[in-house]
Amino acid sequence: MELKLLQDNGQIGAGVDASPEVFGRDYNEALVHQIVVAYQANARSGNRKQKDREEVKHTTKKPWRQKGTGRARAGMSSSPLWRGGGRIFPNSPEENFTQKVNKKMFRAGMRSIYSQLAREGRINVVDGFTVDAPKTKLLADKFKAMGLDSVLIITDSLDENLYLASRNLPHVAVVEPRQADPLSLVHYKKVLVTKAAVAQIEELLK
């Protein structure tokens, strides 16, 4: 199969041969959903803290005697049943959100994403993608000429000028094939891949 070549002026050029094993697979929506959710879950870190009955500030004095008042027995005011008491199952920053995804499943999901991008015309090949200086304006002008606004660039080797120029653009990311993740691939409107990076992607996902 072929991937369309995108020129610097935004015009579509001749096709570039690509492996149908990576870019011609059927779309498995359930698998893609699973690996995207797992990727987001694995990026989470615990940032919530609630106190249990041992941690809330309280007195250990018994609120009233055990028998004879007609009220339900109570041991201390830190009980989770009381207003201001501790939580029974409190949130903790040590919570583990990790979801395991097997290598075969991950590769199959990535192949499915790349294939769907190719079908939708959201992935294009470029001969190379560089800027002369680490200036955001140079890169912004280049994207404007190409008619692009939300772009993920997958390059075979990270160019320092390109990386520095892209950091201040809100909808642009530059990665190497090994760093491409399922969330970024589905998030950006357009994915640009250098010719050498296509071969690296095929090698990673074969």
Curated annotation (Swiss-Prot):
Residues 59-70 have a biased composition (Basic residues). GO terms for biological process: translation. Belongs to the universal ribosomal protein uL4 family. Pfam families: Ribosomal_L4 (PF00573). This is Large ribosomal subunit protein uL4. One of the primary rRNA binding proteins, this protein initially binds near the 5'-end of the 23S rRNA. It is important during the early stages of 50S assembly. It makes multiple contacts with different domains of the 23S rRNA in the assembled 50S subunit and ribosome. Part of the 50S ribosomal subunit. The keyword Metal-binding does not apply. Residues 49-58 have a biased composition (Basic and acidic residues). It comes from the Bacteria. GO terms for cellular component: ribonucleoprotein complex; ribosome. GO terms for molecular function: rRNA binding; structural constituent of ribosome. It comes from Cupriavidus necator (strain ATCC 17699 / DSM 428 / KCTC 22496 / NCIMB 10442 / H16 / Stanier 337). Keywords: Ribonucleoprotein, Ribosomal protein, RNA-binding, rRNA-binding. The lineage of its organism: Bacteria, Pseudomonadati, Pseudomonadota, Betaproteobacteria, Burkholderiales. InterPro entries: Ribosomal_uL4, Ribosomal_uL4-like, Ribosomal_uL4_dom_sf. Residues 43-94 are annotated as: Disordered.
